[in-house]
């Protein structure tokens, strides 16, 4: 699932990296978590823009979700925050900003912007 988030940001010309969280940094219920971080030219560092987590069966147990097959069981659940809108907008503007005050429009958005290359 995290690859969809990474591809989304890269399609907007935003440099990203993934970071697997250590067990000491995991929130309640999480078995494994991976953060997606975007580059901030202004701050000269990466900042979190998304997260993907495996919660094991803890969430389904709390919610009483059961799956059936050969036996009834609690399914494992996954969570993926693809876009946190304020963070995505910051990353988009910072990475596509030009010195003259214009913003580059990534190729994937140009058909929706009348073919414009900048705004």
Model-identified regions with their sequence ranges:
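TRNA-recognition modules of translation machinery and tRNA-sensing kinases, especially anticodon-binding
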Residues: 1-119
């Amino acid at each position: 699932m995290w690859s969809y988030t990474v591809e989304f940001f890269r399609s907007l010309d935003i440099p990203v990296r993934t970071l697997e969280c250590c067990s000491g940094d995991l929130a309640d219920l999480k078995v494994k978590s991976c953060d997606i971080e975007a580059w901030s030219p202004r701050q000269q560092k990466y900042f979190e823009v998304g997260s993907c987590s495996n919660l094991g069966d803890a969430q389904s147990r709390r919610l009483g979700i059961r799956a059936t097959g050969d036996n009834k069981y609690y399914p494992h659940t996954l969570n993926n925050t693809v876009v946190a809108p304020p963070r995505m907008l910051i990353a988009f503007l910072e990475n596509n900003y030009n010195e003259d005050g214009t913003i580059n429009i990534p190729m994937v958005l140009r058909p929706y912007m009348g073919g414009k290359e900048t705004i």
